[in-house]
Structures are given as structure tokens and as C-alpha cells.
Amino acid sequence: MLAEIKALGFDYVELSHGTKIVLLEGILRAVEEGMMKISSTHNFCPLPMGITHSAPNLFEPSVSATQEHAQWLRHTKRPIEFSARVGATAMVTHLGSVHFFWSNPVRKVKRYLRANPEIDPATDEGYRKILTKACNKLRNRIPAYWEQVQASLEEVRAYALEKGVMLGCENREKFQELPVDADYAEFIKGLDKDG
């Protein structure tokens, strides 16, 4: 795989959260031989044993449940180690999401869009009303999850610094993923512990 990328003229690659363990031997050989350099990796790279598909949200730093948090911590430190081993200076991670039990507001938004495929979401009043309600419900639930995300990142921060790996926080895929766009600047500012 890396030989093909090199043949296209690239010297650096980013390894994704879909990198399977069976590819590691070839990746490590390519790096050791100087054929390819790794610029960055993703959390859960390589994929944990038993996972065979791309899984950026396999474990989330926003979840406070002890067992899942322990898995997130374990499977975040491992890719940090791997990043350092292959010379990558950054590891990209997703920040988790807000969870809803029974009343996930996203369902209403999706239902409305499916029932009204012809509307323009930017101008349709019905859609805007449902979306505003969904955003308000999301906003009300964010604080507890957000605190957990920040605490989780703080748990791996020193380890990443020790290994010479920066943590990169990637954009969201879904409505309920963190951070919401309006909070991103404040989030980044809050990570600057050294001024």
C-alpha cells in the first residue's frame, strides 16, 4: 500500500482509524527502510483486536462510564505510542458525543427531512423550528459531556507530550458530536495550559 502511495509521488502519509493490525508489519518496514514517512495517525490506529472496520468513535472521551473510559484511555495511549514509534508528530482524535436515551432530537430532524425531501433547509420554517429545538436540547446536555472530554484529554496530555506527539482534534461527523462549532475556539483556548 505504501509503495503505491510513494509511486504517486508522496513522501508522507497519514494513517487512519481504519488501519488494520495485519498492515503493521509492512508499514513498519516501509518506515524503517525510509521509503515512507508518517506525518500523523488517528486514534485507534492500529485498530484494536477484533475490530475490522474504520472506527473513529469506538470509545469516546466524553463517556464517563468507568469501563468505557478505561478502554478509551488504553486505546488512546496505544496509538500515541505507535505514533512515536513511526515518527508521526500528531495523532488525530474525535472528541465524543452527547448521548440521549429516549428523546434524541436528531430523530425528529431526520424524520422531517425524510418526509419533506423537496424543502430548502435554509429557508423552511418548519425545519428551522425543529432544528432550533434540537440544538437547544443538545446545548442543554453539553456541559457534563464537555467536562468529561476535557478531563479525558488532560489524562493523556502529559503522555503525548512525553512521546513527542501532539493531539489533533478532528471535526465532527454527526449532529451530537463534540465540540459544536460555536464552542471550538473556546475549547482550543482551554487546552493551552502553558499560556
Question: How would you describe each model-predicted region?
Answer:
Residues L15-T19, S40-C45, T93-L95, C169-E173:
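A cross-domain feature marking catalytic cores of carbohydrate-active enzymes
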Residues P61-G195:
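Active-site acidic/histidine proton-transfer and metal-coordination neighborhood
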Residues I5, A30-V31, S83, A160:
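A generic structural signal for well-ordered alpha-helical segments
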Residues G9-Y12, K37, F82, V86-G87:
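Short loop/turn motifs at secondary-structure junctions
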Residues M1, E14-A30, P48, H99-W102, ...:
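Acidic-and-aromatic substrate-binding clefts and catalytic sites of carbohydrate-active enzymes
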Residues L23-T41, R107-A122:
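Short acidic, glycine/proline-enriched helix-loop-strand junctions
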Residues F44-E60:
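A short glycine/small-residue-enriched secondary-structure motif
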Residues A3-D11, E33:
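A short, Lys/Arg-enriched amphipathic alpha-helix followed by its capping loop at the start of a domain
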